């Protein structure tokens, strides 16, 4: 499961042609500022000691906000022993009750390993320049053994469409601008919200 999506990129030179964050210039500036300060870095699951945190966008009080999240879940003060950087869309769709809090993860590329060749492939939205897109995620609060509190997140993986299935059988669930509000509000039943997100992706 860890190989499903264990790294992605966020290029500070990215454009936002789909207007994912067009209505919030301050958020977009914060995001690009973070990307510039971390230019050239591959975004990886958060390490227990390094504590690398990555940008996520959530909704609070009807407004979108940029937070730094811990990629993977914290359980009993430590990174979970079960794989938690990714969550299968089917698992969420079958969930009883409401979804965990929803978020999106800004990115300009993601990386998948093709098996058995162990060859890495990079996927992105722009042909000539990096373009922003949004990975669907769910979040939950977490706390380390020393008492520090974090927002933890898990990237949602869906069955890969046919055009990508030759590389990997799973792919991140992408949230387009037109569906961003519905996704971040997270009000629909899980099965409906996940089905709609996949249809819009």
Predicted regions and their residues:
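Short linear sequence motif anchored by a di-proline
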Residues: 1-201
